[in-house]
A protein has these predicted regions:
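Rossmann-like NAD(P)(H) cofactor-binding subdomain of soluble oxidoreductases
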Residues: 1-47
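Long, compositionally biased stretches enriched for glycine and/or charged residues
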Residues: 50-209
Length: 209
């Protein structure tokens, strides 16, 4: 792998977060991002929008941590039109636990469902990758959940971040419930284990261009 020393490198290959850490280690000085949970967050919003009959553009909901089964859904801050999802469910007499179980399963295993139905799942990740590239090229300063190295956890994982021409300009760690914060810690642990497995495999040494 070759990269310019001032490049912003976006890792798309599944599993993107551990591979972003490998890229960061093998290309020192390169700004490395992973697509992380951006696509998962979009799917989270779409599913919530469908459930409530609302345009996903007006749904505020994020998935953080690992792009994988240990990802964390931020239900405590999920809102539609500024109204907490928990309050909307209470008005309808619905239980959040039931919706949560079904929706999280659908988002976590969306790729498998799509592949079974269409024999391909590249379109969603292709769209979000192109969108991230636009944010960087146009210095949009957009705020999205995206994977970047988090010194606090020792791995690349997704948190809401300001994205511009130099990659992640600032990480905006959101308010979380105790359960969500513990989920993020466990997600980081899972990523550390995955990174250890990747590191244990032989690979060619990368050089900078």
């Amino acid at each position: 792998m070759r990269a310019e020393s001032n490049a912003v490198l976006l890792v798309v290959t599944d599993r993107p977060d551990p591979l972003a850490d490998v890229a960061r280690e093998t290309c020192p000085g390169t700004l490395v991002l992973s697509t992380g949970t951006y696509l998962d967050s979009q799917r989270f919003r779409v599913h919530l929008g469908k459930h409530f009959g609302a345009d996903p553009a007006h749904v505020e909901a994020q998935v953080i941590g690992d792009h994988g089964t240990s990802q964390v859904f931020l239900w405590s801050s999920a809102r539609i039109g500024g109204v907490p999802v928990a309050a909307l469910l209470a008005r309808r007499g619905e239980r959040i636990d039931e919706l949560r179980q079904a929706l999280e399963r659908d988002v976590r295993y969306a790729n498998i469902t799509i592949i079974e139905g269409h024999d391909a799942s590249q379109y969603g990740i292709g769209i979000v990758s192109a969108r991230i590239a636009e944010m960087v090229l146009n210095d949009e300063r957009a705020v999205i959940p995206i994977g970047s190295y988090q010194k606090k956890f020792g791995v690349t994982l997704s948190l809401p971040s300001i994205v511009g021409r130099r990659g992640v300009a600032e990480v905006l760690e959101p308010e979380m419930s105790d359960e969500e914060r513990e989920g993020l810690r466990k997600s980081a642990e899972a990523l550390n284990k995955a990174l250890h497995r990747v590191r244990s495999k032989p690979r060619e040494k990368a050089t900078l261009g």
